[in-house]
Amino acid sequence: MVKISDNSEIYDLIKDVTYLLGISIIEINTFRRRDEFKIQIVLYKSDNFSVDMLCDLHKMILLKLEAVLKYNVSLEISTPGINRKIKSDREFKIFEGKKIKLMLNNDFEEGFILRAERDGFIFKTEYKEVKILYSNVKKAKLS
């Protein structure tokens, strides 16, 4: 299977459904082999995100994708998980208020994302509150 890097078409097809339900699209991965299209979507909602809601979303999204795409579609929907690696600056906004492990130099430090901003975020530990630039983050993951 070949991974496809531009997922904007998939995003545009599903963003209205997720937005209405207060759900953030964290990540979309697409793979294609001949006439088969595999789509993996990671979604996040801060509260009341049940398995039943995931099942309903799967049905709604699959119907939208099958109506537009010319391939056989295989769809996986999941949540970020408790130890998700934060992969983009945009995710700091999505996970505001969440506890993270952050690596700036060579050590991890635990704290909370208080507020995400355009160029960085406010990180609160037990002893300090500091602005961290996204460009200084080596690794970050939910904790």
UniProtKB/Swiss-Prot annotation:
Cellular-component GO terms for this entry: cytosol
Alphabetical list of Pfam families matching this protein: RimP_N (PF02576)
UniProt key word Cell wall biogenesis/degradation: no
Coiled coil: none
InterPro entries per the UniProt record, alphabetical: Ribosome_maturation_RimP (IPR003728), RimP_C_sf (IPR036847), RimP_N (IPR028989), RimP_N_sf (IPR035956)
Domain of life assignment: Bacteria
Gene Ontology biological-process entries: ribosomal small subunit assembly; translation
Record keywords, A-Z: Cytoplasm, Ribosome biogenesis
Cellular compartment(s): Cytoplasm
Family indicated by similarity: Belongs to the RimP family.
Function according to Swiss-Prot or TrEMBL: Required for maturation of 30S ribosomal subunits.
HAMAP family the UniProt entry points to: RimP
PANTHER family attached to this UniProt entry: RIBOSOME MATURATION FACTOR RIMP
Name this protein carries in UniProt: Ribosome maturation factor RimP
Protein source organism: Borrelia duttonii (strain Ly)
